[in-house]
């Protein structure tokens, strides 16, 4: 048995409960929802900015709360492309990373 199948058949697994996410405390969750709703290259921008910001955080060049600031700055600055192609996604990702590194490095 794999993954969730094991829990379904094993009565010793505790029940899972979920609460609504606190989008004020976890701003990136709200930004991710907005990017998903917007579509196009918005998720590529979000991902590139998040990866760059987390990298800077791990290097102790950025505080944890600034990760959301960096992602939001990139989403605001990178022009969105509704026509999602591989090239458009890669370009949006690169632009987002460039913005984060330029602004927060």
At which residue positions do the language-model features occur?
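Catalytic, metal-anchored helix/loop core of enzyme active sites in primary metabolism
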Residues: 4-5, 9-105
């Amino acid at each position: 048995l794999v993954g969730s199948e094991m829990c379904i058949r094993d009565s010793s697994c505790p029940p899972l409960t979920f609460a609504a996410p606190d989008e004020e405390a976890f701003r990136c969750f709200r930004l991710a929802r907005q990017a998903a709703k917007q579509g196009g290259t918005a998720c590529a921008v979000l991902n590139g900015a998040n990866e760059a910001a987390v990298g800077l955080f791990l290097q102790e060049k950025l505080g944890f709360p600034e990760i959301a600031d960096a992602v939001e700055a990139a989403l605001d600055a990178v022009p969105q492309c509704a026509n999602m192609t591989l090239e458009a996604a890669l370009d949006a990702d690169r632009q987002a990373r460039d913005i984060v590194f330029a602004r927060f490095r």
